[in-house]
């Protein structure tokens, strides 16, 4: 992750929203460069660490919170739950998200795990922690990313424009106090370990669209190629 001013690496709205975290983001960059210097790599690739903050801040209308990047090399691309289109064997969580998407909206199963079409419609796919070590889930928890993403979420809620938050799992649900007055949709995490405990059947996509309509906003076209 390059050592640059926020205005040079983030979308202008995000650069302003995250200005209170400029020192923390710089410190996280120092941490990642120290990891590389010590012979330890991290995921996702440096140019994708802050990818979620490169889409327009003012356009965000749905927030989907993940935990941290996929620890399998070649999968994490800077968006929660998404993988590159060439990844053929999808993570279990994403398979379950697609299963619920098809059941909720009666749409065909997506052909790959690229969720970029959602981001183009104002869906922010944000991990609570933005990096991890290869094959070590949660390796960078408590290092400082939580402060950054908390500020991002507070800034979104403070805009006073339509917003719906989809919170899957206990980690994501802990962010509810920072999201008021935005409506939240909460359930178990889509992980294969927990999806049967309330994720399946929760209909998050249709419910999110209903909340958007109630706020006078256009619904999201959740269909994926």
UniProtKB/Swiss-Prot annotation:
Active site: 68 (proton acceptor)
Classification via PROSITE patterns: U_DNA_GLYCOSYLASE (PS00130)
Function: Excises uracil residues from the DNA which can arise as a result of misincorporation of dUMP residues by DNA polymerase or due to deamination of cytosine.
GO biological process assignments: base-excision repair, AP site formation via deaminated base removal
Keyword DNA repair: yes
Entry's Gene Ontology cellular component terms: cytoplasm
SMART domains documented for this protein: UDG, UreE_C
Organism: Parafrankia sp. (strain EAN1pec)
Entry keyword set: Cytoplasm, DNA damage, DNA repair, Hydrolase
Name under which the protein is recorded: Uracil-DNA glycosylase
Record has Transmembrane as a keyword: no
Cell compartments where the protein resides: Cytoplasm
InterPro entries: UDG_fam1, Ura-DNA_Glyclase_AS, Uracil-DNA_glycosylase-like, Uracil-DNA_glycosylase-like_sf
Disulfide bonds: none
Catalysed transformations (reactions): Hydrolyzes single-stranded DNA or mismatched double-stranded DNA and polynucleotides, releasing free uracil
Family: Belongs to the uracil-DNA glycosylase (UDG) superfamily. UNG family.
GO MF, any single term: uracil DNA N-glycosylase activity
Primary location group: cytoplasm
């Amino acid at each position: 992750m390059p050592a640059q001013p926020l205005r040079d690496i983030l979308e202008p709205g995000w650069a302003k929203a995250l200005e209170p975290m400029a020192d923390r983001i710089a410190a996280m960059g120092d941490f990642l460069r120290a990891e590389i210097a010590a012979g330890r790599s991290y995921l996702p690739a440096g140019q994708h660490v802050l990818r979620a903050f490169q889409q327009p801040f003012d356009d965000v209308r749905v927030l989907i919170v993940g935990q941290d990047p996929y620890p399998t090399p070649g999968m994490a691309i800077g968006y929660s739950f998404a993988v590159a289109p060439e990844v053929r064997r999808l993570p279990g969580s994403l398979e379950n998200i697609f299963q619920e998407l098809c059941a909720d909206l009666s749409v065909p199963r997506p052909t790959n795990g690229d969720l970029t079409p959602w981001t183009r419609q104002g869906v922010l796919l944000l991990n609570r922690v933005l990096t991890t070590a290869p094959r070590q889930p949660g390796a960078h928890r408590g290092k400082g990313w939580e402060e950054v993403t908390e500020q991002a979420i507070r800034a979104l809620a403070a805009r006073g424009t339509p917003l719906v938050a989809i919170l899957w799992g206990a980690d994501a649900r802990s962010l509810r106090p920072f999201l008021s007055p935005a409506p939240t949709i909460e359930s178990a995490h889509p992980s294969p370990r927990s999806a049967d405990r309330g994720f399946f059947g929760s209909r998050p996509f249709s419910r999110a669209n209903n909340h958007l309509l109630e706020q006078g906003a256009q619904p999201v076209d959740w269909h994926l190629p």
